[in-house]
């Protein structure tokens, strides 16, 4: 049977970490340093709540001020120095009951691991725009790589505010004749060099402080209504496609597909060793809906999850600390 080039059927990681914020990256430092083959899958360079924080001054051992993105880069370099592998890719599905466990990304890749640490944060949207669900698959999309080619030489809107949204918009701009990049806030949360490159694309128009109100059409999308927060007026963009890449505060756990125990608010339930209801699957960070949302707290949970993974993989009777 032919095997897709996007798969690596013979490569099995000891641990796959989903998310590269402080919890996921700290976990990677510990598992890689312990000698376990470690893969970290992350959605964007400025991943998670820390990645878009403008100034950090209270992270122990790191004199500030520095941006959350800069702090993440320091942590990732430390994890890489121990052998952790970082791969950019948005996780859309998992099979946690297979052996080994499987993780799938939006671009069609499959990764396999003996254990999983879910550290994907809490930045999903809880509420959808009017018309979003109605036109899903008929002009509304959450994947530029998947659907951009359907809008060749057509105008589209891309809704987002970070470097992940920019990356998707840049790909979409290869096909669409016009890309309106709609940002609800007053700024884009991405490294300056990324924004500068994006602004130079000839068929891209950035609309700051424009809040989406409604996606309109008949059988397919015909446009999107926006509220110009600067001029305090509504406008209609005539577009044939709307790509949505916005975040929120809801735990990012859709890819788990209900395979682990969660609360009504989609918070993952773990035991004292950070293990979920599925053996070999652990969780750390904001996916647990902690009352205190601080980078150092998330990092501590990532450490604890990593030590529990070490215990699980090695068959030890108790968690052994690292120094």
From Swiss-Prot:
Show the InterPro entries listed in the entry.
Answer: FAD/NAD-bd_sf (IPR036188), FAD/NAD-binding_dom (IPR023753), Ferredoxin-NADP_redctase_2 (IPR050097), Pyr_nucl-diS_OxRdtase_2_AS (IPR008255), Thioredox_Rdtase (IPR005982)
Keyword Metal-binding set for record? no
The positions annotated for binding FAD are 42-49, 286-295
GO CC terms on record? Answer: cytoplasm
Subcellular location as annotated: Cytoplasm
Q: Which reaction does it catalyse?
A: [thioredoxin]-dithiol + NADP(+) = [thioredoxin]-disulfide + NADPH + H(+)
Between which residues do disulfide bridges form? 143-146
Keyword terms: Cytoplasm, Disulfide bond, FAD, Flavoprotein, NADP, Oxidoreductase, Redox-active center
Which prosthetic group or cofactor does it need?
FAD
Q: Name one GO biological process term.
A: cell redox homeostasis
* Cofactor descriptive note: Binds 1 FAD per subunit.
EC number of the protein: 1.8.1.9
Q: What is its main location?
A: cytoplasm
Q: Which Pfam families match?
A: Pyr_redox_2
* GO MF entries: thioredoxin-disulfide reductase (NADPH) activity
Task: Give the family from UniProt.
Answer: Belongs to the class-II pyridine nucleotide-disulfide oxidoreductase family.
Quaternary structure, from the entry? Homodimer.
Q: What else is known?
A: The active site is a redox-active disulfide bond.
Q: What protein name is recorded for this chain? A: Thioredoxin reductase
The organism is: Aquifex aeolicus (strain VF5)
């Amino acid at each position: 049977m032919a095997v897709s080039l996007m798969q690596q059927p013979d490569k099995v990681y000891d641990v796959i970490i989903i998310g590269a914020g402080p919890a996921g990256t700290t976990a990677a430092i510990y598992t890689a340093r312990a000698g376990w083959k470690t893969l970290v899958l992350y959605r964007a360079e400025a991943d998670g709540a820390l990645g878009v924080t403008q100034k950090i001054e209270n992270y122990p051992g790191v004199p500030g001020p520095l941006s959350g993105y800069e702090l993440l880069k320091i942590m990732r370099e430390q994890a890489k120095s121990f052998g952790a592998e970082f791969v950019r890719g948005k996780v859309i599905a998992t099979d946690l009951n297979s052996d080994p466990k499987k993780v799938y990304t939006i671009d069609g890749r499959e990764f396999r691991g003996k254990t999983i640490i879910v550290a994907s944060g809490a930045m999903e949207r809880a509420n959808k725009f009017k018309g979003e669900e109605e036109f899903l698959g008929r002009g509304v999309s959450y994947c530029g790589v998947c659907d951009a080619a359907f809008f060749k030489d057509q105008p589209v809107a891309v809704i987002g505010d970070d470097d992940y949204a920019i990356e998707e918009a840049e790909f979409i701009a290869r096909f669409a004749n016009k890309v309106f990049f709609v940002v609800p806030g007053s700024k884009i949360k991405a490294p300056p060099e990324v924004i500068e490159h994006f602004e130079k694309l000839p068929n891209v128009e950035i609309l700051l402080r424009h809040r989406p109100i409604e996606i309109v059409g008949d059988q397919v999308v015909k446009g999107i209504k926006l509220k110009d927060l600067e001029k305090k007026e509504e406008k209609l963009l005539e577009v044939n496609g709307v790509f949505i890449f916005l975040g929120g505060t809801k735990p990012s756990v859709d890819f788990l597909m209900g395979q682990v125990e969660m609360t009504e608010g989609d918070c993952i339930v773990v035991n004292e060793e950070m293990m979920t209801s599925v053996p070999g699957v652990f969780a750390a960070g904001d996916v647990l809906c902690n009352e205190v949302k601080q980078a150092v707290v998330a990092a501590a949970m990532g450490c604890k999850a990593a030590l529990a993974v070490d215990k699980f993989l090695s068959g030890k009777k108790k968690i052994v600390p690292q120094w």
